[in-house]
Amino acid sequence: MLRKRAHSSEWSRQSDVTALPILSPAMTSALVLLNPFAGGGRAAKLEDAIRTHVRSDHPGARFVVAGTVADAHAMIEDTPPDARIVLVGGDGTVNRMLPALVRTQRELGIVPLGSGNDVARALGVYGLAWVDALAHALSAPATAMDAGVVTFGEREVPFLACCTCGFDSAVALRALNGPKFLRGLPRYLLATLRELVALRHWQLTVHCEGKPLRAGTTLFASALNTPTFGSGIPAVPHANIRDGLLDVLIAGRFSRAGAMVMLPRLLLGKHLADPRLHSNAFRGIEIHATPNVPIAVDGEYLGESAHLLIDVLPATLRVVARTNDTPAIT
């Protein structure tokens, strides 16, 4: 059983009473929950438009803007068992709601208005106008999706897109604290360039399902469920969110010049032929690090640890996806 994250934090504002719907939870067929801080405040600018649209075009749905993560979890848990949860935000929004979604087994739809949106990319809904994404999230069928969980210290944190260790996590922290006027890939690339100035390495020992996988100087070791991370970077293009496996991408020692040469290859998904990179599918891995390695999940920085476990949670969540044969929304 997943434990509730100890650091549940505020969305940074109190609940807006005017955003609360007329419908009671018992009458709700879906809960549309908006994170006003997603996408650097982009979601907040659409709050009134989305609320009005939900009330006029989707009267069975309930629209809310939660003041805190705890409030949002409580709203999810108060919805009827067959109600769908539609999150308006990005990967961070989805990650913070994931414990409640897994615990209640509610179906998940996404309206991607965040900075990262790698989960939305994997589900095929990234790039849709929010009106179309909302209609799809409320009406299309759901399918099973894998998740992952990282355990370190006393914490057990689930994720849908990725768990990064090392350089990638340091970049995630810089991206979270980056300029507000940048979103998505440009923000991530700026954070990457800034972290290259430091270019730290760690001594990592990685075991995959009990067998040695790698030991030595390592730039990063990141586990992916989705093909992309960092706002669309195709780190493991062959990753599959429904295969019951995660994929680890491990980078050995890189100089600054070598990392700069590798970056455009990574952006194009042409990096896996490099002998300093190793990719391996797994159900569970164990990592020992010296010194403590920074950890992030779905772009959310968690802290540092000398020891962590990463495991797949097969078919743990039902999500609304869109494939090439999904009928167009009209």
Walk through the language-model features, giving the residues of each.
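ATP/nucleoside-binding phosphotransfer catalytic cores, i.e., glycine-rich phosphate-binding loops
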Residues: A43, C208, A215, N240-I241, ...
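Glycine-rich phosphate/pyrophosphate-binding beta-alpha loops
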Residues: T164, D168, S222-V236, Y301
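Short amphipathic alpha-helical segments
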Residues: A44-L46, M97-L101, R121-L123, P234-A235
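Catalytic core of DAGKc-family lipid kinases
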Residues: D57, F63-A66, V102-E107, V111-L219, ...
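ATP/NTP phosphate-donor binding region
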Residues: L2, D16-V88, N95, R103, ...
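Gly/Ser/Thr-rich active-site loops/lids in small-molecule metabolic enzymes
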Residues: P179-R187, F229, P237-G258
